[in-house]
Amino acid sequence: MESSRVRLLPLLGAALLLMLPLLGTRAQEDAELQPRALDIYSAVDDASHEKELIEALQEVLKKLKSKRVPIYEKKYGQVPMCDAGEQCAVRKGARIGKLCDCPRGTSCNSFLLKCL
């Protein structure tokens, strides 16, 4: 039993010696990657990128404000009127949500989701 331990010990030592160079190259790769990552995200680009994002968000907010349904329509459960041929519903899986009421003489087609 002791002879097997004596044989196993040098084998483990040799395996460890073979693994050391592999671990060293990985540490070098990590050191090479860190400076490159810092170069990509510089402070100058960050400020201009933030300004672009803020401008884009402001545009989106303006569009959302213009599309809002007036409070009194929400309060009384009314749905806004839409024109003939306009999209009147949205399909989400098996459910269909109503976007607007179709004018007289037309109805919301459940296949095309338009006032026909």
UniProtKB/Swiss-Prot annotation:
Which terms are listed as keywords in the entry?
Cleavage on pair of basic residues, Disulfide bond, Neuropeptide, Neurotransmitter, Obesity, Phosphoprotein, Secreted, Signal
**Induction conditions:** By leptin.
The PTM Phosphotyrosine maps to Y41
Q: From the UniProt record, which GO molecular function terms apply? A: neuropeptide hormone activity
The stretch of residues making up the signal peptide is 1-27
Q: Which cysteines are joined by disulfide bonds?
A: C82-C100, C88-C108, C102-C115
Tissue/organ expression: Hypothalamus. Found in neurons of the ventrolateral part of the arcuate nucleus, in the external zone of the median eminence, and also found in terminals in the periventricular part of the paraventricular nucleus.
Residues found modified as Phosphoserine: S48
Its annotated compartments are:
Secreted
Q: Which GO terms describe its biological process?
A: adult feeding behavior; cell-cell signaling; cellular response to starvation; chemical synaptic transmission; circadian regulation of gene expression; G protein-coupled receptor signaling pathway; intracellular glucose homeostasis; negative regulation of appetite
* A Pfam cross-reference name: CART
> Its GO CC terms?
extracellular space; secretory granule; synapse
- Please give the function described in this protein's UniProt entry: Satiety factor closely associated with the actions of leptin and neuropeptide Y; this anorectic peptide inhibits both normal and starvation-induced feeding and completely blocks the feeding response induced by neuropeptide Y and regulated by leptin in the hypothalamus. It promotes neuronal development and survival in vitro.
Similarity-based family = Belongs to the CART family.
The molecule here is called Cocaine- and amphetamine-regulated transcript protein
Phylogenetic lineage? Eukaryota, Metazoa, Chordata, Craniata, Vertebrata
